[in-house]
Amino acid sequence: MVIDRAGYRLNVGIILVNDSDRVFWGRRSGHDAWQFPQGGLAPGETAMQAMYRELHEEVGLDKGDVEILGSTRRWLKYRLPKQYLRHGSEPLVIGQKQKWYLLKLVTSEQKVRLDLSDSPEFDSWRWVDFHEPEQQVIFFKRQVYIQALKELEPLLKKERRTPYGLKRKRGNQRA
């Protein structure tokens, strides 16, 4: 776990989209809470390395299963409410500082596996409309989700264009 001087845990978030621009939305194991895949950086690990590790651990996908469409320009952060702070742990983590990645699924969704870890993060998942997570995520993560989705959404439109500015057809076909 990597924590900055201010007490924020360095973390990556993953927005995985399909050909219909719907996003992967996972239900946390044992909770009625939904979120994007995310996870902390290990010491010496880059954000991109952490992103691929978390993608595999939480969703069962590897580098060849996705295309990186982009990432947030800066780290986005949120503070944990007092009731979520773990006062008995050292160092005290007051929130998360996250680098967000927008990934396009380029393989079959049948490759998604939630059971590759001894303690899976998710027990269920579904595709939802691009902005639906903004309303469903737990309240203290909401602003970061809004910021990440707003910043990364234009990359979907850019990805659909050819060098001549024509829209790409849905699916694997190119216009």
From Swiss-Prot:
A motif (Nudix box) lies at residues 39-60. SUPFAM superfamilies: Nudix. Keywords: Hydrolase. Its cofactor is a divalent metal cation. Coiled coil: none annotated. The keyword Hydrolase applies. Disulfide bonds: none annotated. Gene3D superfamilies: Nucleoside Triphosphate Pyrophosphohydrolase. Residues 7-150 form the Nudix hydrolase domain. Its EC number is 3.6.1.-. InterPro entries: Nudix_hydrolase (IPR020476), NUDIX_hydrolase-like_dom_sf (IPR015797), NUDIX_hydrolase_CS (IPR020084), NUDIX_hydrolase_dom (IPR000086), RppH (IPR022927). Transmembrane segments: none annotated. It holds the Pfam family NUDIX. GO terms for molecular function: pyrophosphatase activity. PROSITE patterns: NUDIX, NUDIX_BOX. Belongs to the Nudix hydrolase family. RppH subfamily. Accelerates the degradation of transcripts by removing pyrophosphate from the 5'-end of triphosphorylated RNA, leading to a more labile monophosphorylated state that can stimulate subsequent ribonuclease cleavage. This is RNA pyrophosphohydrolase. The lineage of its organism: Bacteria, Pseudomonadati, Pseudomonadota, Gammaproteobacteria, Legionellales.
